């Protein structure tokens, strides 16, 4: 008797969860982000200017996208295998990141998507050498990469 009682109770609970009122969740929040037209290089570098054009993209709100200030497209393969050419990165604007974090950088007028190594920018693809900073280099961080959009 006890097993049959438990089975019936579980069956009733399962039916209740599938009722239409169980699916009356709030609509998912849509966020609008700037997608900058110039790609951050995952390779040898491309120019990035503060007056770069952008388009707007809509993304579903979630804990990651809600922290993003803008998006930017990857160009190149130096961050393979984790990041591919054409991936759209979600970026939280900041001018400082910790060693080991991924970021968008400008070094001497060229933009990069790399891992920050303190005195260098590091590619994830071992076929690419580190970019070591010299005394006269002009380095700026535009933001921390916090995720990417699924294709």
Language-model region placement:
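Thr-Gly-centered strand-to-loop micro-motif
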Residues: 74, 91-92
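Glycine- and charge-enriched low-complexity intrinsically disordered segments
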Residues: 118-151
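Short, compositionally biased
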Residues: 77, 99-120
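Short, positionally conserved secondary-structure boundary motifs
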Residues: 3-85, 99, 110, 134-135, ...
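Residues that recognize and position ribonucleotide moieties
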Residues: 72, 114, 139
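Short, hydrophobic/aromatic-rich beta-strand segments within well-structured domains
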Residues: 20-22, 89-91, 102-105
